[in-house]
Amino acid sequence: MRARLPAKLGAAVCLLLCAWFLAPLGMGIVHIGMLWPSALLVLAAVRLLRPDVFRRLLRKKWLRWTVRAALGLGLAAALGIFGWMVSAAANRAAPAESTVIVLGCQVRGTEPSLTLQRRVDAAADYLRAHPQARCVASGGQSDDEEISEAECIRAALIAAGIDPARIEPEDQSTSTEENLRFSAERIRAAGLSTNVVIASDNFHQLRAALWARHCGLTPYAAGCRTAWFLAPGYWAREIAGVAYTLLT
């Protein structure tokens, strides 16, 4: 069956979006947020170009309706979580002198990755604007990192002009949940404000806020943008991460 021009254009858009999601492969990056949207986009392109294939596969009416219902519910849930994530990233009206928590991510050798540097920059901006505020640099060390994420964050903040005495390192965490749980322990031990400004990517703010509230903290956002070629996959991965957090 020969596809019509609108179907061909739609399929081309799907494949271009698929290429965008898979772009980080060129940097050796692979994660679930790149894979599940790409698979759905390829299926959508095939559906547009060869609808007869899907008609043969979904001959039974009950099966067609089951697939449609599952896709519809999944899409509605994903859009709902996406809207919630955007709202969480906009929650920036923190009380004066809140405690900053910088959430760690990949360190390249001893230097921050592009993503981590943007988080450090967001934290440094807040700390310069609030000279009495303190900061927790949170993140452990993985096998391919020469120093802990906390140590890297601390060094980058000092290089940005932040007084070392204002920075409390937390170098044991290996997940967002541990970032917030261990940071909450440090904050209480040091007698710091439990109003916290979370310095992380915009896509990460919702899940971080959920864990912060679970740990008895009141979260606000100091979000930063993700590099354009990384953003689609990380937002998609985080949608799955939020869904998993809510279900477990």
Residue positions per predicted region:
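Membrane-embedded alpha-helical segments of integral membrane proteins
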Residues: 5-53
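Transmembrane alpha-helices and immediately adjacent membrane-cytoplasm interface residues
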Residues: 43-91
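A structural signal for short, hydrophobic/glycine-enriched beta-strand patches
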Residues: 80-237
